[in-house]
Design a protein with these regions (language model features):
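Alpha-helical phosphate/pyrophosphate-handling elements in metalloenzyme active cores
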Residues: 1-18, 30, 42-51
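Divalent metal-dependent phosphate-bond-processing catalytic cores, especially two-metal-ion Mg2+/Mn2+ enzymes
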Residues: 2-12, 24, 52, 72-161
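His-Asp-centered metal-binding catalytic motifs of divalent-metal-dependent phosphohydrolases/nucleases
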Residues: 15-35, 39, 60-69
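Residues at secondary-structure transition points
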Residues: 34, 45, 97-99
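Helix-adjacent hinge/juxtasegments
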Residues: 37-80
Length: 161
C-alpha cells in the first residue's frame, strides 16, 4: 500500500484505483484457485456493496486479476504497473531481513548462520526479479533495496566468518 502511494506520487495515475487495488490485491488467497481471480471477485463484490463507481471497480478488478502475472508484457495501465511494482517492492529490502530472521528464529536449530544463509538465498532468488518491474521508478527503488540487502549480507559475513 505504501509503495503504491509513493510510486503514484512520482508517476501519477488515479490514486483511488491504485490505493484500493493495492489494499485489496491479496484478499483472495486460495489453495485451489489463483488468488488474483479469487481476489478480483471478492474486491468487485465488496466495492460494489460500498457504492464505488462501477468504472473504477472494473479497473480495480482487472488489476487484482492480473497483478500476480509479473512476467507479462501485456499493455498494462499505469495504475496496474504501479500496483505490480508496489507488490514486488513490498517483498524486498530491510523488511525481508526481518521476515527471514523471524522465520529462522522459530526453527528448531535457529542460529545467526542459518539466518545468514536464508537471507543470502532470498537475495539470490530475488535479485533477478528486477526485470519484472513495470516502471522505471519501480526498477530504481528495487535496485536500491537489493543494494541494501547486498550491503547487509556483506557486513554480516564480516561479523560471522
Amino acid at each position: 500500500y505504501r509503495w503504491a502511494i509513493k510510486l503514484q506520487s512520482k508517476l501519477g495515475g488515479d490514486l483511488d484505483i491504485i490505493v484500493l487495488a493495492a489494499l485489496l490485491h491479496d484478499v483472495g488467497w486460495d489453495d485451489e484457485r489463483p488468488h488474483g481471480e479469487v481476489g478480483a471477485e471478492i474486491a468487485v463484490n465488496y466495492l460494489d456493496s460500498l457504492g464505488v463507481d462501477p468504472q473504477k471497480i472494473a479497473k480495480i478488478g482487472e488489476i487484482i486479476m492480473i497483478h500476480e502475472e509479473k512476467d507479462t508484457d501485456a499493455d498494462l495501465s499505469l495504475e496496474c504497473r504501479i500496483v505490480m511494482d508496489a507488490d514486488l517492492l513490498d517483498e524486498v529490502g530491510a523488511i525481508s531481513v526481518l521476515w527471514d530472521s523471524m522465520a529462522t528464529a522459530i526453527e528448531d536449530e535457529a542460529s545467526y548462520k542459518r539466518a545468514y544463509y536464508r537471507i543470502k538465498n532470498f537475495y539470490k532468488i530475488n535479485k533477478p526479479k528486477i526485470k519484472r518491474c513495470k516502471t522505471e521508478a519501480g526498477r530504481l527503488e528495487y535496485s536500491k533495496r537489493m543494494q541494501l540487502l547486498e550491503d547487509f549480507i556483506f557486513q554480516l559475513e564480516k561479523e560471522l566468518f
